[in-house]
A protein has these predicted regions:
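Class I (Rossmann-like) S-adenosyl-L-methionine-dependent methyltransferase catalytic domain
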Residues: 1-49, 53-106, 124-130, 135, ...
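Conserved acidic functional residues
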Residues: 61, 109, 119
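A short acidic, Gly/Pro-enriched loop at the edge of an enzyme's catalytic core
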Residues: 105-115
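A short SAM/SAH-binding and catalytic strip from SAM-dependent methyltransferases
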Residues: 114-127
């Protein structure tokens, strides 16, 4: 727990007060235009009860609020949520939660149909991503999905992420898939993303919480296959 809190401090401090939030507004279209890679992935989410992780100043939240029955905005910085409250003042279906930086508490077990996180997890260290994936399996409903925009750069772990290209932390599509599997989530789709003119700098991964734990499902399939092989064959 202490190590996770230390990682949150390293990753989160730079974004408490940053010019990024104002600058990023002009690039919001990248995530929502139909000819961009993000939109087809997002359209596969069930938005009845959706949470945006690391919502910042709400540039995506503003778009999603009108599409969702229930939208939860989550951020480690209360100041960001204050900005979102102003921005979404006319939306009656939104709740605002400050979180730890490594899990979805206080969100209730099995209460979300979807989670998404854009342009934030690219900076998260692997231990934080692993922790979030484990808790995503807790808060998602069976069959619920989560869409994560993350780094695809196998960066030097001994170098501060802020010194990397576009401040990307250490993560790859393959490693993300491993962490999702360990958390009990199934990868539905994943692809590399070009960012700031840098080929395949990022990854986009869509995961699903199975209605039956995928490891149990594998065991059952193995059992049925074994029984089928042992069954007498009639000629």
């Amino acid at each position: 727990m202490a190590d996770l809190k230390a990682s949150v401090e390293v990753v989160g401090e730079a974004w408490k007060k940053s010019a990024y939030y104002a600058d990023a507004e002009q690039w919001t279209f990248i995530f929502w235009d139909a000819d961009q890679p993000f939109r087809p992935f997002f359209d596969r989410l069930d938005l009845r009860a959706v949470l945006e992780l690391a919502c910042g100043h709400g540039r995506h939240s503003e778009i999603v609020a009108s599409k969702s029955s229930s939208l939860t905005l989550m951020d480690i910085h209360p100041e960001n949520l204050d900005s979102c409250r102003v921005r979404l003042a006319s939306s009656g279906n939104v709740r605002f939660l400050t979180n730890s930086g490594y899990d979805f508490a206080p969100v209730e077990d099995g209460s979300l149909s979807a989670i998404f996180c854009y342009d934030a997890m690219v900076h998260f260290s692997p231990d934080l991503i692993a922790s979030y994936l484990v808790d995503a399996a807790r808060v998602l409903k069976p069959g619920g999905r989560a869409l994560f925009h993350h780094s695809n750069r196998d960066a030097d772990p001994d170098v501060h992420y802020g010194q990397n290209l576009q401040a990307r932390n250490r993560m790859t599509l393959a490693r993300f898939a491993e962490l999702a599997d360990q958390a009990g989530l199934m990868v539905m789709d994943a692809r590399p993303i070009d960012w700031a003119g840098i080929a395949k700098l990022d990854g986009l991964t869509l995961v699903r919480k199975p209605r039956i734990h995928h490891r149990v499902l594998r065991s059952l399939r193995g059992l049925f296959a074994s029984r089928s092989e042992k069954a007498p064959r009639h000629t």
